[in-house]
């Protein structure tokens, strides 16, 4: 399949690597090239899922992600962070349909992770909802399939994750950005931590449900 998985992390998030890999292995149901981009700490393997790991001395988050993208030999990239713990089965059928539709409708980013939140959508002549020209999150790190060339264009080397979303979205306001969302999707993941590495509300319930260790 014409798809790679890009996972961003940092040394500080090392306690998340085991539960992330466990839930990824449990709910990601097809073979893909999975690229884990970190900083200086080697990322252990906790499950049967194979990850290609790259440690980068780039000082910025976006600089490291751009190095990871160089290893992606596919036209499309499923881009996520390591504090996203899946509890929804992503199948080969899901991905095949989404990628075919991205090619058919010339989509740059297709968000595939659940309810709209703060995003604003408009109708389109596709099976998906289109982000409005003034949507606050045209760029989002929520689980999405990206056209590789578009992702590279948006990742300025100096960006933090927050710059990527906020500044990146502001630069695309009122442009033909071609970003869409499958709004039929349920919530597909639990966001384990918030700013400051604080555990998210609901972590204990999710941990018990998924039989995960605390971190």
Q: Where is each model-derived feature located?
A:
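N-terminal anchoring/stem segment of glycosyltransferases
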Residues: 1-62, 68-76
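Short, solvent-exposed loop/turn segments at secondary-structure junctions
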Residues: 10-13, 40-43, 83-86, 115-119, ...
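Well-ordered, non-membrane alpha-helical segments in soluble/globular domains
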Residues: 18, 91-99, 161-167
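A structural signal for short, well-ordered beta-strand segments and their strand-loop junctions
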Residues: 35-36, 77-79, 108-113, 145, ...
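Short beta-strand-to-loop acidic/aromatic patch adjacent to the donor-nucleotide binding site
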Residues: 75-85
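Short, flexible, basic/aromatic active-site loop/helix in glycosyltransferases
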Residues: 122-136
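Catalytic core and acceptor-binding pocket of nucleotide-sugar-dependent glycosyltransferases
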Residues: 138-206
């Amino acid at each position: 399949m014409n798809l790679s998985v890009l996972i961003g992390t940092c040394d500080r998030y090392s306690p998340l690597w085991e539960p992330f890999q466990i839930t990824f292995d449990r709910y990601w149901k097809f073979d893909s090239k999975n690229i884990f981009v970190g900083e200086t700490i080697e990322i252990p393997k906790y499950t049967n899922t194979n990850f290609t790991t790259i440690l980068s001395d780039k000082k910025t988050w976006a600089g490291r992600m751009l190095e990871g993208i160089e290893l992606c030999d596919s036209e499309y990239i499923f881009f996520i962070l390591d504090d996203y713990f899946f509890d929804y089965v992503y199948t080969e059928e899901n991905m095949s349909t989404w990628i075919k539709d991205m090619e058919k409708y010339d989509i740059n980013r297709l968000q595939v992770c659940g309810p709209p939140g703060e995003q604003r959508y408009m109708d389109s002549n596709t099976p998906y909802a289109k982000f409005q020209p003034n949507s606050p999150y045209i760029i989002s790190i929520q689980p999405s399939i990206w056209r590789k060339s578009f992702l590279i264009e948006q990742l300025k080397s100096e960006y933090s994750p927050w710059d990527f979303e906020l500044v990146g979205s502001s630069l695309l306001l009122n442009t033909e950005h071609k970003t869409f969302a499958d709004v039929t999707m349920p919530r597909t993941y639990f966001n384990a931590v918030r700013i400051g590495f604080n555990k998210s509300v609901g972590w204990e319930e999710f941990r018990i449900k998924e039989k995960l260790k605390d971190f």
